[in-house]
Amino acid sequence: MLASTFATHPAAAAAARRRGPIRWRLPFCSQIVTVTLRRRFPMARLSITNALASQSLESAPAAPPKHSFPILVNSCTGKMGKAVAEAAVSAGLQLVPVSFSAIEVPDGKVEICDREIYIRDPSEGESILPSIAKDYPDMIVVDYTVPDAVNANAELYCKLGLPFVMGTTGGNRQLLHKTVEDANVYAVISPQMGKQVVAFLAAMEIMAEQFPGAFSGYKLEVMESHQATKLDISGTAKAVISCFQKLGVSFNLNEVKQVRDPQEQLTLVGVPEEHLSGHAFHMYHLTSPDETVSFEFQHNVCGRSIYAEGTVDAALFLHKKIQSGANKKLYDMIDVLREGNMR
C-alpha cells in the first residue's frame, strides 16, 4: 500500500504530534528474500556428468520449448530460490537440475514442480559449474543466497563468464558492480525485484533528480519490517533513503528502525500472521521543520511471488540482451521495466 498524507493546518500538525511515533496503517498485501548459502565457492575438478553419476540426470523433464533457455537457481533450498524456480518453470524455462547450498537436504535433492534438483555443496561450485555450463548452453544463473556470499559468488560467475541475475541483497555493492564491469559479463543487479515497487523507486529517482533539495530541512523517520531471517537492512529502504537524501533530507542508515520480532510485527506493524515468515513492509514519514506539513509513503508486500515473477522477467530480459549482442552488459530492474518486458 502506498499512502501519502499532506497536512498544512496547525491543528492537523498538532494531531500528528499527539500521534507519537510513526504507526503502520492496515496492510495491503500483494505478494522476500530468504537465503541459504553460507560458504563461499572454492573447488575439485569433475564434470557434471561424473559429479552426478550416482544421481542420473535422466530423470529430468523433457526439453522445454525452443524459445526457452536453461536457468540455474542458487539456492533452491531457500524459500526465495524455491519461489523463483517455480516461477521459472511456469514461464516455460528449463530449470537446471542442480543447485548449490550449504544446507543438507534428505537424499541430497529437493523436488520443485515435479523436478528433482540435486543439491551440491558451495565448495564444489568452481569445479562443477563449468561442466554444467557446457551441458546447458545459454544458461543464466539466478542468485538468492546470503549477503556474505554476494561478492564471492559474483566473482565466480564472472570468472566463468556466466550471465547472472543477482537478487541477493547486501555485500559490497560498489565492488559487485566493479567486478561485473571489469569482467564484461552480462548481469542484472537490483536490490528490489518486485516490478511495481521498482516503478515506485523509479518515480522517487525522477523526483530526486528533478527537484533536488525540495525537502531540505525535513525530518525523516523510516521503519521497515521483514521476516526474522533477513539479516541486513532492506535494500529497497536504502534506495528510497538515498532519494530523500538527494531531496535535501539529512538521514543516516543507523536511524532506520528494523522490526524483526514477530510480536512487534503483529501488533505494531500489522503484518498478517500467515505472512510473518515472508513479508516486506516499509514506511517513510517526513515532517517539515515547523511540523505543519507531513508526508507519508508506505509500501507493503506479503509473500514472495512478486519478487519471483520479477526475477524471471529479469532473466528473460537478460537472455534477450545476450542474444542481440547488446553492447551494454550491466543492467538493473529499471532497465527491465523500461524495456516493457513485464509479463
From Swiss-Prot:
Catalyzes the conversion of 4-hydroxy-tetrahydrodipicolinate (HTPA) to tetrahydrodipicolinate. It comes from Oryza sativa subsp. japonica (Rice). Its EC number is 1.17.1.8. Keywords: Amino-acid biosynthesis, Chloroplast, Diaminopimelate biosynthesis, Lysine biosynthesis, NAD, NADP, Oxidoreductase, Plastid, Transit peptide. CDD domains: DHDPR_N. Pathway: Amino-acid biosynthesis; L-lysine biosynthesis via DAP pathway; (S)-tetrahydrodipicolinate from L-aspartate: step 4/4. (S)-2,3,4,5-tetrahydrodipicolinate binds at G235, T236. Belongs to the DapB family. The keyword NADP applies. It is found in: Plastid, Chloroplast. It is an enzyme of class 1 (oxidoreductase). One of its GO terms (cellular component) is chloroplast stroma. Residues 1-14 form a transit peptide. It catalyses: (S)-2,3,4,5-tetrahydrodipicolinate + NAD(+) + H2O = (2S,4S)-4-hydroxy-2,3,4,5-tetrahydrodipicolinate + NADH + H(+); (S)-2,3,4,5-tetrahydrodipicolinate + NADP(+) + H2O = (2S,4S)-4-hydroxy-2,3,4,5-tetrahydrodipicolinate + NADPH + H(+). One of its GO terms (molecular function) is NADPH binding. Pfam families: DapB_C, DapB_N. This is Probable 4-hydroxy-tetrahydrodipicolinate reductase 1, chloroplastic.
